[in-house]
Swiss-Prot record:
Family per record: Belongs to the bacterial ribosomal protein bL33 family.
One cellular component (GO) term of this entry: cytosolic large ribosomal subunit
Species of provenance: Chlamydia abortus (strain DSM 27085 / S26/3) (Chlamydophila abortus)
NCBIfam families: PRK00595.1 (NF001860), rpmG_bact (TIGR01023)
Chain ranges passing through the membrane: none
Name the record gives this protein: Large ribosomal subunit protein bL33
Gene3D superfamilies: Ribosomal protein L33
UniProt lineage: Bacteria, Pseudomonadati, Chlamydiota, Chlamydiia, Chlamydiales
Length: 52
């Protein structure tokens, strides 16, 4: 289980409707998360942004 410092977030692709779920430390990462990950629908790496 995640502790109270961490929050489960959704990462949404900037180019398609693909999504990832991950955990973020709220104390260390106060801004919105932005990662480059593999998009399974487009079959290439794109930027995924944190969505609420």
């Amino acid at each position: 289980m995640a502790s109270k410092n961490r929050e489960i977030i959704k990462l949404k692709s900037s180019e398609s409707s693909d999504m990832y779920w991950t955990v973020k430390n709220k104390r260390k990462t106060t801004g919105r998360l932005e990662l480059k990950k593999y998009d399974r629908k487009l079959r290439r790496h794109v930027i995924f942004k944190e969505a609420k």
